[in-house]
């Protein structure tokens, strides 16, 4: 039995969240009655309102009046008044992943998981399938520039979704094709141990039906180990590793992007195939690897080499993934969501490959607990930055941890050999600090999952105001 068409209204608590908003938008486009609430106004809230969705700002019991079902994410606390009211009224309460799973049952699905690179890879798979006239439905964890939204309802048989592993609920998603980009120690507040994280990814792949397949990056040692443990499922490996079934070759930086080729090897059939002259308008090895995963899926689904080439060359990117926000006196300002040491290192390496000038990193650490648990990694991931400007920790709802703050991080970076580290007093001071450091040809890269994105977009104008 599938989600009945007559059910509704469907009420989303926290509808403005990037994961919740995409599901709400697709349900609305399918004809379901959708409503919701969020703690504050936002671009996502405004976009959904424009589609006719009623949204309350603030959470209170009266907001759920008339609802047939309540959808919540793990960010919603157990004492939320709307959640309490729904349970008191015996209204069914479902998790975000459960509702996403219901949508996935309507289509054949590609689900993209991994500690890093999910959003970009999801966008690339969507772009390639779209170019191949498969007209996919898409639910992503970031705004796809080509769509201006993180979700779209397609008319084809395929759906492409980002599978968020943070709370383990990605195991509920019925994927026909699974991508695993990498697996690092993250979300240990939920999983407790890294072994549990790895077990979850193994189960995610083994949940794929016998007629499906998984695409896994064996450049990552943990993923390579997982490949050896998974039985009775078809796996296509990818990466620069010579053992990869889809091997990334001849990667080179070119005009702010990358060029490369992908060589396929079918061990069972004993055949080989190569797609050459691939161009991606994004820099960085990490983005080329993400593209290789998407190419592997597209190739397996029968898209022509020429379609893949054209779609990749036209890829418009994802908001907050190496997004240029403006220029000032020849200085390029970049906004990026990177907030884990692995992501930060990859973004800064891409910036280094994109300019002969200096790379100036502006970082807003995200969560005290993450900075504490990965402190050594944070202190060693800025090697490609000539200067590091450190803002206060963005708490994301966490209470401060004694000794884990901006100044402690600054001292840690200096102790690890960074010679030019600046403690940022506040966002209003950023333009003045950057103006004193940057010259024509330099890149200023703003990094973090908090409100630093607003600083990145304001910075070009603030710098121009200084003269």
UniProtKB/Swiss-Prot annotation:
Classification via Pfam families: Mur_ligase, Mur_ligase_C, Mur_ligase_M
Pathway info: Cell wall biogenesis; peptidoglycan biosynthesis
Which is one GO molecular function term here? ATP binding
Top-level taxonomic group: Bacteria
Q: Which reaction does it catalyse?
A: UDP-N-acetyl-alpha-D-muramate + L-alanine + ATP = UDP-N-acetyl-alpha-D-muramoyl-L-alanine + ADP + phosphate + H(+)
Annotated EC: 6.3.2.8
InterPro entries in UniProt? Mur-like_cat_sf, Mur_ligase_C, Mur_ligase_C_dom_sf, Mur_ligase_cen, Mur_ligase_N, MurCDEF_pg_biosynth, UDP-N-AcMur_Ala_ligase_MurC
**Binding-site residues for ATP, renumbered to this chain:** 114-120
- Extract one GO BP annotation from the record: regulation of cell shape
- Indicate whether DNA-binding appears among the record's keywords: no
What's a single GO CC term here? cytoplasm
The keyword Cell division appears for this protein: yes
Q: Where in the cell is it found?
A: Cytoplasm
Q: Which UniProt keywords apply?
A: ATP-binding, Cell cycle, Cell division, Cell shape, Cell wall biogenesis/degradation, Cytoplasm, Ligase, Nucleotide-binding, Peptidoglycan synthesis
Role summary:
Cell wall formation.
Q: Which NCBIfam families does the UniProt entry name for this protein?
A: murC
Q: Which family does it belong to?
A: Belongs to the MurCDEF family.
Protein name (record): UDP-N-acetylmuramate--L-alanine ligase
């Amino acid at each position: 039995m599938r989600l009945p068409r007559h059910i509704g209204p469907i009420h989303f608590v926290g509808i403005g969240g990037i994961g919740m908003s995409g599901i709400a938008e697709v349900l609305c486009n399918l004809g379901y009655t959708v409503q919701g609430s969020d703690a504050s106004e936002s671009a996502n809230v405004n976009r959904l309102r424009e589609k006719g969705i009623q949204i309350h700002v603030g959470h209170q019991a009266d907001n759920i009046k008339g609802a047939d079902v309540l959808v919540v994410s793990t960010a919603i606390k157990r004492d939320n008044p709307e959640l309490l009211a729904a349970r008191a009224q015996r209204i069914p309460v479902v998790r975000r992943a459960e509702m996403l799973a219901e949508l996935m049952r309507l289509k054949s699905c590609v689900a993209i998981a991994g500690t890093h690179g999910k959003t970009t890879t999801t966008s690339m798979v969507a772009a390639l399938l779209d170019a191949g006239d498969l007209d996919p439905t898409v639910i992503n964890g970031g705004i796809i520039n080509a769509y201006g939204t993180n979700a779209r309802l397609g008319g084809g048989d395929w759906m492409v979704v980002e599978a968020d592993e943070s709370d383990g609920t990605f195991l509920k998603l019925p994927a026909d094709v699974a991508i695993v980009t990498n697996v690092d120690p993250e979300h240990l507040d939920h999983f407790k141990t890294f072994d549990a994280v790895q077990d979850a990814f193994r189960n995610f792949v083994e949940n794929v039906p016998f007629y499906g397949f998984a695409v896994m990056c064996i450049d990552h040692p943990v993923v390579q180990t997982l490949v050896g443990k998974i039985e009775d499922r078809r796996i296509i490996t990818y990466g620069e590793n010579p053992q990869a079934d889809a091997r990334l070759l001849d990667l080179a930086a070119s005009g702010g992007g990358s060029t490369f080729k992908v060589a396929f090897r079918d061990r069972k059939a004993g055949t080989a195939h190569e797609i050459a002259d691939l161009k991606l308008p994004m820099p960085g090895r990490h983005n080329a690897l993400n593209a290789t995963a998407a190419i592997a899926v597209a190739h397996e689904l029968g898209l022509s080499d020429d379609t893949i080439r054209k779609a990749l060359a036209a890829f418009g990117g994802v908001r907050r993934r190496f997004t240029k926000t403006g220029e000032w006196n020849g200085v390029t300002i970049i906004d990026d969501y990177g907030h884990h040491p692995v992501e930060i290192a990859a973004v800064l390496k891409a910036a280094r490959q994109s300019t002969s000038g200096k790379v100036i990193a502006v970082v807003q650490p995200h969560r005290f607990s993450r900075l504490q648990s990965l402190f050594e990694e944070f202190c060693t991931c800025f090697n490609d930055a000539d200067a590091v400007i450190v803002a206060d920790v963005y708490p994301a709802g966490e209470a401060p941890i004694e000794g884990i703050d901006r100044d402690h991080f600054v001292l840690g970076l200096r102790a690890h050999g960074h010679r030019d580290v600046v403690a940022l007093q506040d966002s209003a001071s950023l333009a003045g600090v950057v103006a004193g450091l940057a010259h024509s040809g330099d890149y200023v890269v703003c990094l973090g999952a908090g409100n630093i994105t607003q600083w990145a977009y304001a910075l070009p104008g603030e710098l121009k105001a200084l003269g």
